[in-house]
């Protein structure tokens, strides 16, 4: 390849004149290249331009390029993963740190004979604390601190990820009735969390008003086999305490209706179960007043939970509640995601 061939080499990248004139695309590209100063090299520089290209293609470079083309493509290099590197430190190099820590509180960690310290460099006063002996933190101490800091962070993160995150449900913004986890299972509150100071007495008519009696009422949920949900757009109160059954199956208990919504508790003492759904331990819903399953209303912004609480007196809704609980069993409808 000589300098006389430079014109022919440049012509390889150009179209014939008649095709260039007839092609609007080539004209647009040429205009764009001229605007950005990306045109072809001038005629005066053709000799130097071709000479540089010829000189760069020497025999050694050509062999290297040919050899690389024959080789298999290299594996893509992974990005640096801090968590992976930390796990390697925890798993593979743990014995080094244990050996370093168990050296009778003296920094005798020998790393390529560069950090060996004699006992003469340490303070001989036994009353001085070990942390006060070396004011200057060396590389080994810094490495140890980094290890334990990362180890405790990893352990704390593992404990947090192992436990289910809890969302505390509050009713009337005055008491936590139960704990519902992200796995949508209702957990029983321990006995220490129950409100023992809350007196269980028959409520007066003034306490039936959700705006008056709920401010001082604190109820806890006991039995998880008979949870009732009132899902209605008319309901404005998100709190309800009601209709109870003990763990032994004895339904002859009074109902604390101080937190029951107005649309559930009627003036005649009869309970309207048209908008009340039963939730069993598997979080399956079924209607109480009708045997057909009912899904919660999608227009309502919340669901009212009627939890059970034990009282000493009976009310008029006892018999009706007992019959409804015994008569209607939950049917198969999709689970309610709380």
Curated annotation (Swiss-Prot):
Cysteine disulfide partners in this protein: none
Listed Pfam families: GATA_AreA (PF08550)
Disordered: annotated span: 1-21
Organism: Saccharomyces cerevisiae (strain ATCC 204508 / S288c) (Baker's yeast)
Listed name of the protein: Protein REG2
TM spans (from-to): none
Task performed by this protein: Regulatory subunit, binds to type-1 protein phosphatase. Functions with HEX2/REG1 and SNF1 protein kinase to regulate growth. Might regulate SNF1 directly or indirectly.
GO molecular function: protein phosphatase regulator activity
């Amino acid at each position: 390849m000589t300098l006389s061939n430079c014109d022919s080499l440049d012509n390889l990248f150009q179209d014939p004149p008649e095709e260039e004139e007839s092609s609007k695309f080539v004209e647009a590209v040429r205009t764009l290249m001229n605007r950005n100063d990306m045109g072809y090299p001038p005629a005066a520089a053709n000799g130097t331009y071709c000479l540089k290209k010829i000189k760069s293609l020497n025999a050694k470079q050509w062999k290297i390029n040919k050899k690389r083309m024959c080789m298999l493509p290299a594996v893509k290099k992974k990005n640096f993963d801090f968590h992976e590197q930390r796990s390697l430190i925890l798993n593979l190099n743990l014995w080094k740190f244990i050996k370093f820590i168990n050296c009778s509180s003296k920094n005798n960690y020998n790393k390529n004979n560069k950090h060996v310290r004699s006992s003469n460099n340490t303070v001989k006063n036994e009353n001085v604390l070990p942390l006060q002996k070396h004011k200057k933190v060396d590389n080994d101490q810094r490495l140890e601190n980094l290890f334990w800091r990362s180890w405790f962070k990893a352990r704390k993160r593992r404990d947090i990820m192992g436990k289910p995150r809890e969302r505390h449900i509050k009713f009337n913004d005055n008491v936590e009735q139960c704990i519902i986890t992200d796995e949508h299972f209702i957990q029983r509150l321990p006995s220490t969390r129950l409100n023992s100071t809350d007196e269980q007495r028959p409520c007066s008519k003034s306490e039936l008003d959700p705006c008056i009696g709920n401010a001082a009422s604190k109820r806890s949920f006991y039995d998880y086999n008979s949870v009732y949900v009132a899902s209605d757009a008319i309901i404005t109160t998100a709190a309800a305490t009601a209709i109870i059954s003990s763990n032994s199956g004895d339904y002859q208990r009074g109902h604390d209706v101080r937190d029951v919504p107005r649309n559930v508790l009627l003036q005649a003492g009869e309970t309207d179960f048209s908008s009340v759904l039963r939730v069993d331990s598997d979080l399956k819903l079924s209607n109480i007043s009708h045997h057909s399953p009912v899904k919660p209303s999608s227009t309502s912004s919340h669901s009212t939970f009627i939890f059970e609480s034990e009282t000493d007196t009976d009310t008029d809704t006892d018999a009706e509640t007992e019959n409804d609980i015994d008569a209607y069993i939950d049917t198969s409808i999709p689970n309610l995601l709380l």
